[in-house]
């Protein structure tokens, strides 16, 4: 490639705020894989937030880029998977498969789309030093003739419109609102944008923990569960943002609750043998968790915790939950899915327009 901006490039990031700030440009926060796309003639590369190439996993995007995008460009955006008027992140995760034959099959059966929201380069021009208002205008021109695969994200400078997006379209899979100062230059790996996301709370059972990478005397993360209507304990996610002193104190406190796997509801080895999907989810199946130790220490389900989360993806927290407080006053069996707040239904993600 011979572009003014070359891969790999870390995307510009956002920091969380509680309210949508005034006086900026606003966009929906799409729920998918962040990717910077590079096209130089017949060459196309899809980068990721971790600067790992994703090109081989989305051949349909590569093919569409050759017909829908300018001949030489670098575009920041989100790879998403539309399904039944919402975004399906679980199905999108399945696209990261090591087998080329399965990649080809999924590309045909569940094709992805690319939502473009920033421009880093066009032709011979580097746009990273230009203000966002100028980059946005150039991006609109660059995508004027785009086809069905590449889409320009809606944007507005009207605060009430941004607030409406935030409240109305969560149920379609939108992840909140992004705010960008109009004079903002493109700053890779810097948290200079702003994001506002939904926050909810849930009381969960702590049913296990993983050790911290520092050693065998500190907790790395706590595994959370909620009870089904039939009384089985379902795995819903983890919390892990603790100071080191708290990690060590938790390790000591939890030793009295350590159980064996034989009668633990999350005996993955036995369950995975009977359920290939469970084996994929907890035992691997994509390059992103290759080599990662997914083992854990089982606990009797007696410790309860209140956590903050943004939204669910299927039956699990979409992102890592955040610790709020311990709940010694609650009974474990009261920690059920019934307490969860469902987002309002949205008719379609495509209705998120100015």
UniProtKB/Swiss-Prot annotation:
Q: Which GO terms describe its biological process?
A: DNA recombination; DNA repair
**ATP-binding found in the keyword field:** yes
Q: Which Pfam families match?
A: DNA_ligase_A_C, DNA_ligase_A_M
Q: Record's CDD domains?
A: Adenylation_DNA_ligase_LigC, OBF_DNA_ligase_LigC
The record's statement on gene disruption is: Not essential; a double ligC1-ligC2 mutant grows normally, no effect on NHEJ. In a triple deletion with ligD NHEJ on blunt-ended plasmid is 90-fold impaired. In quadruple ligB-ligC1-ligC2-ligD deletions NHEJ on blunt and 5'-overhangs is 0.22 and 0.12% of wild-type respectively; only 4-fold decrease in 3'-overhang NHEJ.
Quote the catalytic residue positions.
29 (n6-amp-lysine intermediate)
Q: Which UniProt keywords apply?
A: ATP-binding, Ligase, Nucleotide-binding
Asked if Transferase is a keyword of the record, the answer is: no
Q: What is its EC number?
A: 6.5.1.1
Q: List the disulfide bonds.
A: none
User: Which positions make up the signal peptide?
Assistant: none
What InterPro entries does this protein's entry cite?
Answer: Adenylation_LigC-like, ATP-dep_DNA_ligase, DNA_ligase_ATP-dep_C, DNA_ligase_ATP-dep_cent, NA-bd_OB-fold, OBF_LigC-like
Coiled-coil regions listed in the entry: none
A single Gene Ontology MF term assigned here is: DNA ligase (ATP) activity
Reaction(s) catalysed by this chain's protein: ATP + (deoxyribonucleotide)n-3'-hydroxyl + 5'-phospho-(deoxyribonucleotide)m = (deoxyribonucleotide)n+m + AMP + diphosphate
Give the protein's function.
Answer: DNA ligase that seals nicks in double-stranded DNA during DNA replication, DNA recombination and DNA repair. Has weak intrinsic nick joining activities and accumulates DNA-adenylate. Acts as a backup for LigD in the Ku-LigD-dependent NHEJ pathway.
NCBIfam families with a match to the protein in the record: PRK08224.1 (NF006078)
Recorded family membership: Belongs to the ATP-dependent DNA ligase family.
Instruction: Identify this protein by name.
Output: DNA ligase C2
Gene symbol here is ligC2
């Amino acid at each position: 490639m011979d572009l003014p901006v070359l891969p790999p490039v870390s995307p510009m990031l956002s920091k969380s705020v509680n309210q949508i700030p005034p006086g900026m440009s606003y966009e929906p926060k799409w729920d998918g894989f962040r990717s910077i796309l590079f096209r130089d003639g017949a060459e196309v590369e899809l980068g990721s937030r971790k600067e790992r190439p994703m090109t081989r996993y989305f051949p349909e995007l590569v093919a569409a880029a050759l017909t829908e995008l300018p001949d030489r460009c670098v575009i920041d955006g989100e790879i998403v998977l539309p399904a039944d008027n919402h975004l399906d992140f679980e199905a999108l995760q399945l696209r990261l498969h090591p087998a080329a034959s399965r990649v080809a099959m999924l590309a045909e059966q569940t094709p992805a789309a690319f939502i473009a929201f920033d421009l880093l380069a066009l032709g011979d021009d580097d746009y990273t030093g230009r203000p966002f208002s100028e980059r946005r205008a150039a991006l609109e021109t660059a995508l004027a003739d785009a086809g069905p695969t590449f889409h320009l994200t809606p944007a507005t400078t009207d605060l009430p419109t941004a607030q409406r997006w935030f409240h109305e379209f969560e149920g379609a899979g939108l992840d909140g609102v992004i705010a960008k100062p109009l004079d903002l230059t493109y700053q890779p790996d810097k948290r200079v944008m702003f994001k506002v996301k939904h926050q909810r709370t849930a009381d969960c059972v702590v049913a296990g923990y993983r050790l911290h990478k520092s050693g065998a005397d500190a907790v790395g993360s706590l595994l959370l569960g909620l009870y089904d209507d039939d009384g089985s304990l379902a795995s819903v996610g983890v919390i892990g943002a603790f100071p080191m002193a708290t990690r060590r104190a938790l390790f000591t406190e939890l030793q009295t609750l350590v159980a064996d796997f034989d009668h633990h509801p999350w005996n993955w080895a036995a369950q995975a043998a009977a359920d290939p999907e469970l084996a994929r989810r907890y035992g691997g199946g994509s390059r992103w968790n290759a080599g990662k130790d997914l083992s854990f220490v089982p606990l009797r389900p007696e410790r309860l915790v209140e956590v903050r989360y943004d939204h669910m993806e299927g039956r699990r927290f979409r992102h890592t939950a955040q610790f709020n407080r311990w709940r010694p006053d609650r009974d474990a069996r009261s920690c059920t899915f019934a307490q969860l707040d469902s987002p309002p239904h949205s008719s379609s993600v495509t209705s998120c327009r100015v």
